[in-house]
């Protein structure tokens, strides 16, 4: 068991281990990846277990060590990992159940990233004192907004999401970029 004072750090470290495994899996040939779907399923399970541990952390008194900033970062990390895990499936083909499942996962994560960042980056007069720290992380969030917007445009082009929804999220993403 991890010391309660280090639990947040442990959660972040575990997430980056999972993220490294996703990168290792997805940087291989698509032919190899498609022959080993069990590894992707195992990573999906590890990511889900990690997120359950994050939610358990938020539900306990240990959460006093986590600010809104930490919650936003953990949420963004979760959804970036989901997109990283599913993105190669989207690039491979536009047919089949695997594509549809990956696209829906990515749409949900794209929406969550933009919504989370938009709520975290508000006009200065509405911020809580700890949310100023998110500004330090912001340059690394640019990719998250970009890929989220790209996924939503891709989904709209194949009629999986309405143009109105995409427009709304693109506007929120632009507000985040203007921070």
Model-derived regions: residue spans:
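Eukaryote-biased recognition of C-terminal alpha-helical segments
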Residues: 172-179
